[in-house]
Amino acid sequence: MDLITTAHPERPELDMSFSGKLLRAVAQGEMPESMRLFRPGRTVAFGRLDRMRPGFDDARRVAIAHGMTPVLRHAGGHAAAYDSDSLIIEVFRRHDQGLRGLESRFIEMADLLQRAFAQAGVSLVLGELPGEYCPGRYSLHLPGGPKVVGIAQRVLTDASLTTAVAVVDGGEALRTVIAAVYEALELPLEVNTVGAVTDQYPEASCELVRQTLIDCGIADGSLQPTARLEA
């Protein structure tokens, strides 16, 4: 896979549309399979299930009031919040498996993240926490602590996009945002499931995790050791 580092932190909606552009390009064979690593802007990413809830408009206003940009994502369930203290990992693959390869791609991403974080001195546990935000079987959490990584997929006929959001720092601020957004959406939430890696590992940083992700990708042969920037 090629490595892509392009990001639009000042315009989160562009990051969302850029991901869709890359997925379509991979599906059409216009570019090779790739991994995109970037630090996003202040974002609340709503799922399509959120849009059908009566409190959706209020939740968007709440996000804006907290200085976040609301966007609608194509993958995942319910709302997630992240900012420049988070790291987004996107893996674009071309294949004809469709939904048949769904679980294996989730496992592949979770395994990569656990290996990379372990190399950075951080232990992550696979599994959904009771009452977590944007719940999922392949969430990763700190031992006895909060969820710090969510994983989602978008699947086309000829390609897939597996996305992970790792909250490295700034857990307290995001906890406030998510609690307010979920209250507006009238969704259940155990607030203590919201946090960041630095809650237990204060020495962790986005740059450290980014580098260990690249190192792990190169070591297992899935990632080319050169960066490719997209306009």
List each language-model region with its residue ranges.
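N-terminal lobe of the biotin/lipoate ligase/transferase fold
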Residues: 1-100
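Generic non-transmembrane alpha-helical segments
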Residues: 25, 58-62, 66, 112-120, ...
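Short acidic-glycine loop/turn motifs at beta-strand connectors
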Residues: 40, 142-145, 156-157, 170
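Short, conserved charged micro-motifs
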Residues: 54-57, 98-102, 172-177, 205-206
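Short, solvent-exposed loop/turn elements at beta->coil junctions and helix N-caps
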Residues: 75-79, 127-131, 154
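Contiguous, small/hydrophobic- and glycine-enriched helical/loop subdomains that border
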Residues: 84-131
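Long, positively charged amphipathic alpha-helical accessory segments at protein N-termini or as interdomain linkers
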Residues: 120-122, 151-154, 158-231
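Beta-rich nucleic-acid/ligand-interaction surfaces
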Residues: 126-147
